[in-house]
Every structure is written in C-alpha cells, then in structure tokens.
Amino acid sequence: MDNTYNPQEVEEQAQQYWHKKQSFNVTEDLNKEKFYCLSMFPYPSGTLHMGHVRNYTLGDVIARYQRALGKNVLQPIGWDSFGLPAENAAIKNKIPPAEWTRKNIAAMKEQFLRLGNAYDWKREITTCDPEYYRWEQWFFIRLFEKGLVYKKNAVVNWDPVDQTVLANEQVVDGRGWRSGALVERKEISQWFIKITSYADELLSSLDSLDEWPAQVKQMQRNWIGKSIGTEIYFNVNNYPKRLKIYTTRPDTLMGATYLAVATDHPLAKEAASNNKKVQEFLDSCQGIKIAEAELATMEKRGIDTGMTAIHPITGKELPIWVANFVLMQYGSGAVMAVPAHDQRDWEFAQKYQLPVKQVIKPIGIEHDFNQSAYTEEGILINSNQFDNLLSSKAIQVITNFLEENDAGKATINYRLRDWGVSRQRYWGTPIPMIICEQCGIVPVPDEELPVVLPENVDFTGTGSPLTQCKEFVNITCPKCGQDATRETDTFDTFVESSWYYARFACKGQENAMLDDRAKYWTPVDQYIGGIEHAVMHLLYARFFHKLMRDEGLVNSDEPFKALLTQGMVLKDGHKMSKSLGNVVDPNHLINTYGADTARLFVMFASPPEQSLEWSDSGVEGAHRFLKRVWAFSHQHRDMLIDINDSILSGNGHVDWKEAESRLKKSRHIVHQILAQATHDYDRNQFNTVVSGCMKLFNEISDYSIETENDKFFIHSSISILLRLLAPITPHICHCLWQQLGFDKAIIDAPWPKVDKSALKTDEVDYVVQVNGKLRAQFTASTDATEEELIAAAKEHAHNFVVNHTIKKAIIVPHRQLINLVIG
C-alpha cells in the first residue's frame, strides 16, 4: 500500500475490478426488493460538462447507497441520440449525422467510465439504432389503430431557421428553443397523439406523486390547465357557423361589447378574403409572440372585421375583431370581450374606443371603471332578468338558461392540446406511415418494421432531406399494390425519451417492445434531472407510460416514483458557458485530482436541489480530505489488518459496555454521525453526509490508541467511515477496504448498522450562555439534577458572572443549553 494517495492508480484498479467482476450487471430477483435508479439520459454532444458530472454523480450515489442497503439495483445509461444538433453538425462539417453521433457517444462513454459510475453497460441504449426505434414505430401504429393518433392540417409554430415545427413547450419567449429564431405561424399537415384523452388522469394522478417536487407538479397542473366554465354560442351574420367561445365567467355575459378571434381563426380568414386591411393585419401578425407570459405585456393590436355576432340573450349585434392576444391553440380561438370586468379587454377597448358596460357591482367597495376593469365577483346589475344575483349564483343560472335555449352548455376546458409529433427534419425516427391516393393513410405492416432511416441523403441546410430521397419516398402500397409514398416527417425526439426507461428493463428483446422484465423494474424508483423538463419530457413520459399500461406492457400508473431536480453548476455566479469563459473541464479535473475528488466536491458543495457555486479551493479541500483518509489508513494498516484477522477467525470481540469513558464517548459520536448520515442519505442530502464523514474522521484521527479496545474502536470506525463514503468516493474506498483486509469487496458490503446502545450515554455536553452569548462548555452526568447543572454552569462561566446578580437560569434540555440571565 503506497504511502501517498495516487488517484489515477487507485481509480484504474477499482474500475478494472468492477469490469472484471461485472459488478453492476443485474438480473431480476424476486427475493430482493428492487430499486431502479435513473438519471435522464444525455444527448451525445461529445463532451461531458460539470452539469453532467453533478447530475450523473447524484444518480450514482443514490444507486450505490441503495445497493448497500441490500436491494437489487438497476442503474442503466444510454443516449438520446436523435435531434437537430447532429443534423446541423452534418451541414456545417459535411459529416453524416450517424458518424458524428457515434463518435460523440464513444468520447462521452469514456468519460463516464472514468467517473466510475455503477452502470449496467450491457443495457446501453442508443435511440438512433433501428433495433430501438423499431418498437417506437410499432407502438405508434398500435395507437393509430386505437384512434389515438391522427393527421390533420393545423396552424403550428414554425421555426424559419431550423425549418421545422415546434411544440408549444419548445417556444421560449416567442423564439425557437434551439435556434432562437422568432417563431412564425404556419398551416401544415401534422401528426398528433391524443394526449388530451388522458388530460384528466394526467392531472389527477399528480396527487399520487408524493416524492415529486411540489413545483414540478404545479407546473404540470398549470400546463394541463383544467378549468370549469361555460361554452357560449354566438350566431354570426352572413356566416354559416356559430362562433363558440369559452369562459369561466358567464356571469359577465351581459357586459360583452365585442368578440375577438385569433389571427388564424377561420372567421378571420373569411373576413380577410373580402377586406384588404384585415389581410394586411393578419400578415403583420405572422411573427406573433405566442408565449403566454408575454401576452400580458405585449402591445395589444386588432382590427374590426366588419362582421357581427348576435348576443345569445339580448339579440344585440356585437362587432367581431381580430386580435393578436387571442391564441388559436387555447379554447376555441375566440373570446367574448367584457371590458368592464377583464383587464386585457379593458385595455383593448380603451385603445380602440370600444364600449365598456358594467354588469358586476363590487360588494362593499367603490371602483373607478375609467382607471381599470373590476375583475372580482359581485352582484349583477344591468343584466335584465339576472339582476341582483350574486356572481356565484349567476354563473349557474345563466349557464342553465343558455343550455335550455341551445345557446351554450357547461363544459370543462383544458389548456393542454394534442401533442404534435411531426418534425420536418432528417435525423429522427421515420414515421411509419404510407400515403396512397387510393387507400389514404396506410400503416407500414409490422413485418416491414423498422422503417430504417436512409443514410444516402444530401444536406442543404433547409427542409427535410428525406423528401429528396427517391429510394426512401417511393413505395408500393401494402394494401392495394399501387404506387404510393412514404411519410417523410420524423418524430419529435421527445417521443424517443418518453419510453426509454422501460426499454432499459428488457434490452435485447427482439420480439416485443417490452416484456415482463419491464413490469418487474418499473416504475423507476428514483429519477434525476433538471426542472427545465417539467412540462415537456416529464409530461410526455407520464402520458406514454399510461399508453403502455393500457396496451398491457407495464402494470403501474406512473413511470417515476420519486423525482430529484438538481440545481445548475455556476462559476462566478453565472451558469458555465464557453462564451463567458468560465467553463471547468471535467477531464482536466479528473487528470489533476481524480474522479473521487470531483465526485466528493460536487456532493459536498451544495444540497442537490440548489445551484452549486464552483470553487477551486473547495476542490483542493476535498482532495486534501481524501489524502488524509489515505494517509491515516496507511499509518494504521498493520494494526487494522491484525484486527480484521482476529474478527474473521472469531477471536475479535469487545464488550463496549465495559469500555472506558473516553472510548464510549467517541463511539457515541461515531454512531451518532452514522445515524444522521443514514438519515441524510435517505433524504438525498449528500452535502451533510460528507460533512458528517469529515467529523467522523476528525474524531478517530484525533483519538489516542492506548488499549486493545481502542484498536477495535478504530477498526470499527474506519469500517463505518469507508462504507459511508463509498457511494460518493467509490474508488478510494474500494482500494482501502481491500488493502486493510476487510472481507469481500466494499461494493458487496452491507450498510453499517447503528448500535443503539452506543447512542445512549452516561454523560452529556452542555453549553453555557450568559445573556444569550456563548461563554462556556462542560460535561455532566445524564442523571444530574437541575440544581447540579446550574451550579456547574455558574462554575464554568465564573469569569462572566462574578460581581453580577444571576436573575434567572434557563435550562433547554433538548439543546443541552443553559442560559444564565444576569443583571
């Protein structure tokens, strides 16, 4: 055993052992409690950054700890390998996306191996492999057969730079989430999956996710956006269809002074066909900002269509406007405007000098309608037969009236819209559909799956190369035998990441999407990833899990039992980025200090949910601690090996109850730390685990070894310390455990047990405050009376109370604190 800690040698030795023994390859075991730990799989960008190191170390620490508890632990890894960056790199560097992706995977896999993460590599998944996406295509066809998939023309979010459709969630502040381009509105034929059919369950089952952050659940509730309201029908003059609007405030219906429709509403297009100014307005709104957060602050613009609607109760005509603040994807794309009782409608009415009619009277307060709208409930006025009703009652009465007169109905509305999964890009899973002039849309037969993405395509930087690949596009219809064409859109990459966790459970299954192993391993017991995925990946994965459940592929309702959302890694107060020049290279860190130091620092520097501020001195401090542990173990190696031999031969036994006082006290501290660290591991509070390990090490390194019992105490304590540290710094703990003569490998060692008798103590440490300020400390018997404790406190704080009158002595037992109040 070398005297000096050499992390490179230590880590190579540990990793070779794990590889040789296949330590992390697992199979199903019904005799053990299973634990499935998964970090969101990475996109193969080519290099790991410190955010990756933190995220995947968190998952690894949890997996190793659960294994030490005796559970059957699965921790797989794979690659979310489709997506725009590979295609963009192909255009820029003239290299095929597949080649670029494979090269990056190889580089990142090497980095993961150096970190020492306990992955079952035989389950590795790469989503661009046909063997993976074959089953995605198969499942999509099953959904199509069940009526959960459809294709229709839809106004979509179009990214003019990436030349593709974006989901609502992929539009950030009106711009494409990858390109940053201003998003346009465009009508295009799209494939959709009916996520709205599961809206109620997606909402209600959030309540079962007790181990998810409240913030994430609330974000999903807001995104699903369930509201109970009323659908109201307005007849339109010289227009064949009624205009449907949705409102949660039918009590304000009598105050409607105009209607407004979205720029892409059919009625707006009808008006534009006969009105040049309306068409010009629609054209000016093509780049409209669509992020809801911006609707409140953006300039509200509109134009009168010249068309009018009939109020369903009064029969009066109301002008219909096109407005940029009405969104087609929410509600019906039309709203009734009540300027007196909706601030947005009020601002629009002020700008265009539209009438403001008060129909709700505030209760107990005055309101100036010239200054703003009154948006709360109250008593109805100016509402004909509904006058004097409270808003809460009027909502029900007016809705009933509308239903009786076929002018509306009570309804439930959702903000959530069906998931558009088409992307006009090359590097993605081909959508397994055929378009035949005779037969319409025909699914690819199962025996012809997978539809393999061709690699002989040209990249021009715009549109989809698949449309130019005749060998791919032209095909015979499997139904009628006539010439047909393949669908050239590919899946949104969120489709691949919506079910990968289940495929990990049965990697290698060639005859089915999933098998019974998926039912054994799912749901994932602990999922780790960023909160930025709250309303995209996490919602889609929950949806897919329910789809797979209903297909009989899994037997649980939710995919992820517990969710940990880690914070970012910052340097100088900012997120690490090349543009700011504050990036820390994990390779350099590992080459200089070793993977264990990197792991120890990222676990110690901050609680997992909070942002981590990078500190070079913190890294050096973590490294110094590991060197001290190594040096201490080396110093006492012979003694510890002898004690191990005694224990293994059955001769090593200590009656701790008969041990001397100082040993009992130190052993009490060690087991107190063990109990707290175990509790902290259970709560994923790894920073306090490390803090406890440092305290434990200080306790034993300062301990004077004088008797045989002392040797057994040091042996027991170093055994506890190494097992506490092993999930966080697995390499050094593996080597020290072996070199100190402990039985088996530490990866197979059970979690240390707290000796409850050691937690009991004959003595208690007290602190003494004088007028609230810490002045002294002393040790007293647990049997000491209050009088004895106060006397001891006075004695130890003598210099601070002499010549003063002690007015009161306050004992706080649970804090072992005595406060002397002097005059």
Curated annotation (Swiss-Prot):
<protein>
    <recommendedName>
        <fullName>Leucine--tRNA ligase</fullName>
        <ecNumber>6.1.1.4</ecNumber>
    </recommendedName>
</protein>
<dbReference type="Pfam" id="PF08264">
    <property type="entry name" value="Anticodon_1"/>
</dbReference>
<keyword id="KW-0436">Ligase</keyword>
<comment type="similarity">
    <text>Belongs to the class-I aminoacyl-tRNA synthetase family.</text>
</comment>
<dbReference type="GO" id="GO:0002161">
    <property type="term" value="F:aminoacyl-tRNA deacylase activity"/>
</dbReference>
<dbReference type="GO" id="GO:0005829">
    <property type="term" value="C:cytosol"/>
</dbReference>
<keyword id="KW-0030">Aminoacyl-tRNA synthetase</keyword>
<dbReference type="Pfam" id="PF00133">
    <property type="entry name" value="tRNA-synt_1"/>
</dbReference>
<dbReference type="InterPro" id="IPR002302">
    <property type="entry name" value="Leu-tRNA-ligase"/>
</dbReference>
<dbReference type="InterPro" id="IPR009080">
    <property type="entry name" value="tRNAsynth_Ia_anticodon-bd"/>
</dbReference>
<dbReference type="InterPro" id="IPR002300">
    <property type="entry name" value="aa-tRNA-synth_Ia"/>
</dbReference>
<feature type="binding site">
    <location>
        <position position="578"/>
    </location>
    <ligand>
        <name>ATP</name>
    </ligand>
</feature>
<dbReference type="InterPro" id="IPR013155">
    <property type="entry name" value="M/V/L/I-tRNA-synth_anticd-bd"/>
</dbReference>
<feature type="short sequence motif" description="'KMSKS' region">
    <location>
        <begin position="575"/>
        <end position="579"/>
    </location>
</feature>
<keyword id="KW-0547">Nucleotide-binding</keyword>
<dbReference type="GO" id="GO:0004823">
    <property type="term" value="F:leucine-tRNA ligase activity"/>
</dbReference>
<dbReference type="GO" id="GO:0005524">
    <property type="term" value="F:ATP binding"/>
</dbReference>
<keyword id="KW-0963">Cytoplasm</keyword>
<dbReference type="GO" id="GO:0006429">
    <property type="term" value="P:leucyl-tRNA aminoacylation"/>
</dbReference>
<dbReference type="InterPro" id="IPR015413">
    <property type="entry name" value="Methionyl/Leucyl_tRNA_Synth"/>
</dbReference>
<dbReference type="InterPro" id="IPR009008">
    <property type="entry name" value="Val/Leu/Ile-tRNA-synth_edit"/>
</dbReference>
<keyword id="KW-0067">ATP-binding</keyword>
<dbReference type="Pfam" id="PF13603">
    <property type="entry name" value="tRNA-synt_1_2"/>
</dbReference>
<dbReference type="Pfam" id="PF09334">
    <property type="entry name" value="tRNA-synt_1g"/>
</dbReference>
<dbReference type="InterPro" id="IPR001412">
    <property type="entry name" value="aa-tRNA-synth_I_CS"/>
</dbReference>
<dbReference type="InterPro" id="IPR025709">
    <property type="entry name" value="Leu_tRNA-synth_edit"/>
</dbReference>
<feature type="short sequence motif" description="'HIGH' region">
    <location>
        <begin position="42"/>
        <end position="52"/>
    </location>
</feature>
<dbReference type="InterPro" id="IPR014729">
    <property type="entry name" value="Rossmann-like_a/b/a_fold"/>
</dbReference>
<keyword id="KW-0648">Protein biosynthesis</keyword>
